[in-house]
Design a protein with these regions (language model features):
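Iron-associated oxidoreductase/ferritin-like identity signal
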Residues: 1-167
């Protein structure tokens, strides 16, 4: 049986309460704040010709993440919750490839969470909310592709989150 962040059980279909969805969305919102900060900082500190294109792309990503934060905040308010104000911790490095790798890992985790969030919204009958999250998911997948390309890697396959993963 899956267990929600607050310790109460989720049923096998992934149905959760509105309050639990608010908790999950607030965690997502904190992740969006983290992404904004990361992309703003990384876009300015990446140096050298090999990083010019990705640095410009990261600036664009920062704006998209702000848009995501606004959408998620609006959904939390719609559900009767209070949007979070704290970002998740931002990882930094002196090495450009490490910074890009941090972002790649964050995007993979974000995609996992948003896929789960779509299922949770639909299980509560919140189909419009699920559509908003699907739109965010498209951007996050594009970010993943950009980062993998900049790192010279194949785009990683994002696996479904495990039942015990802390979302």
């Amino acid at each position: 049986m899956k267990v929600a962040k607050n310790g109460s059980p989720e049923n096998s279909a992934g149905q959760i309460s509105r309050e639990e969805l608010i908790d999950h969305l607030n965690e997502d919102l904190s992740g969006e704040y983290q992404a904004i900060i990361s992309y703003v900082v990384y876009s300015q500190v990446l140096k050298g010709a090999e990083y010019m294109n990705i640095a410009a792309e990261l600036e664009k990503h920062a704006g998209e993440e702000l848009s995501h934060a606004l959408i998620i905040s609006k959904q939390i308010d719609y559900l009767g919750g209070q949007p979070a104000v704290q970002p998740k911790p931002v990882r930094t490095s002196e090495k450009a490839k490490e910074m890009l790798q941090f972002d790649l890992e964050n995007e993979m985790a974000t995609i996992q969470r948003y896929r789960e969030r779509v299922r949770q919204c639909e299980s509560l009958g919140e189909y419009a909310m699920a559509e908003y999250i699907r739109e965010i998911l498209k951007d996050e997948q594009d970010h993943l592709i950009s980062l993998a390309t900049a790192l010279g890697e194949d785009v990683p396959v994002v696996k479904a989150a495990s039942a015990h993963a802390g979302k």
